[in-house]
Amino acid sequence: MSKRDFYDVLGVSRNASADELKKAYRSLAKKYHPDQNQGDKEAEQRFKELNEAYDALKDEQSRAAYDQFGHAAFDGGMGARGGPGGMGGFGAGASMSDIFDDLFGEFMGGRGGRGGRRGDGGQTRGHDLRYNMEISLEEAFEGKKAQVRVPGSVACEVCTGTGAAPGSSPITCPTCQGHGKVRASQGFFTIERTCPTCHGRGQTIDKPCTNCHGAGRVEKERTLSVNIPAGVEDGTRIRLSGEGEAGMRGGPAGDLYIFLSVKPHRLFERDGADLFCRVPIAMVTATLGGEIEVPTLGGKKVKVKVPEGAQTGRQFRLRGKGMPVVNSRETGDLYIQITVETPVNLTKKQKELLKEFEQASTPGNNPESAGFFAKVKEFWDGFQN
């Protein structure tokens, strides 16, 4: 049966960019990956076809050969001997780790070996996982021990992560002799590609584990305990080493990253380790002075003395009443900002008393307003002159 055009297989035009090729491949590979379509022979064949097409087109040199010679550039009477200098067919295999490698790596500022990396013997490090957790400001203040349910893969208990059935073990790939790569020559072209037999692992499994189907891992939801230290801020990232996705065929597990989001509070605002609270006070208290009770995030009430003549916006600093600093004995401060409340719903008598107060008042009782209106008068006088 004749092979389909590689560009048609990936659903892209012949002038598609490398990024467009990768995007198309990843999208289709996720759809047809054997792990997602177990027992579906058509999906398995489609997946192999996708790998072969992308493997040929992702490299500039092999893509140029394909554009010039078509499929003959790769199967023009060439055998399948592996290893450097040998000749072999082309094709590649992609695990789900390969497909999702970029997706899980990007959230930490780049790939940087964060998963999907193959080691000796075909071992592949598991992906790092991300878990978003929302906590209250009180929980950030006190710290807490939380339970998180993490979906993902864990090492297969039957084969202990090797992928091979009990009593057997992986063997050196006969095609590439354990190199994971094969070379093919066509005229002046010599192109090294991933081994089509072991998919770059250097090993094959004759007797796959029936529990994990040779993957070395199975899907399972886990419940983990996470210690959240007191003083964490919004956006804090907590790393749980080795609690990410299980590796392939005995490879190391990835890490789990807990990203914390602190919910807004109804009374307090936060700036680093400092807390801010706006407290309304009565006009009489602001005028004559007095004592008010203010809340703290720890649940205790603190008394604050308000001096005579206090104005809206006046701040009072309560040292050590703010947020704790993570991994430190230091503590931030609590700032109380008062707002003078104008009385409403006055009785007739209250209004009469205020009118008497107004009549008895002098400009010195309201220096800011008196000074402001004096400046306004000077401003207007300047226009008249």
UniProtKB/Swiss-Prot annotation:
This is Chaperone protein DnaJ. InterPro entries: DnaJ (IPR012724), DnaJ_C (IPR002939), DnaJ_domain (IPR001623), DnaJ_domain_CS (IPR018253), HSP40/DnaJ_pept-bd (IPR008971), HSP_DnaJ_Cys-rich_dom (IPR001305), HSP_DnaJ_Cys-rich_dom_sf (IPR036410), J_dom_sf (IPR036869). A zinc finger (CR-type) spans 143-221. Keywords: Chaperone, Cytoplasm, DNA replication, Metal-binding, Repeat, Stress response, Zinc, Zinc-finger. CXXCXGXG motif repeats lie at residues 156-163, 173-180, 195-202, 209-216. Zn(2+) 2 binds at C173, C176, C195, C198. Residues 5-70 form the J domain. Zn(2+) 1 binds at C156, C159, C209, C212. Its cofactor is Zn(2+). The J domain is necessary and sufficient to stimulate DnaK ATPase activity. Zinc center 1 plays an important role in the autonomous, DnaK-independent chaperone activity of DnaJ. Zinc center 2 is essential for interaction with DnaK and for DnaJ activity. Homodimer. One of its GO terms (biological process) is chaperone cofactor-dependent protein refolding. One of its GO terms (cellular component) is cytoplasm. It is found in: Cytoplasm. Binds 2 Zn(2+) ions per monomer. Its main location: cytoplasm. Belongs to the DnaJ family. Pfam families: DnaJ, DnaJ_C, DnaJ_CXXCXGXG. It comes from Parvibaculum lavamentivorans (strain DS-1 / DSM 13023 / NCIMB 13966). Participates actively in the response to hyperosmotic and heat shock by preventing the aggregation of stress-denatured proteins and by disaggregating proteins, also in an autonomous, DnaK-independent fashion. Unfolded proteins bind initially to DnaJ; upon interaction with the DnaJ-bound protein, DnaK hydrolyzes its bound ATP, resulting in the formation of a stable complex. GrpE releases ADP from DnaK; ATP binding to DnaK triggers the release of the substrate protein, thus completing the reaction cycle.
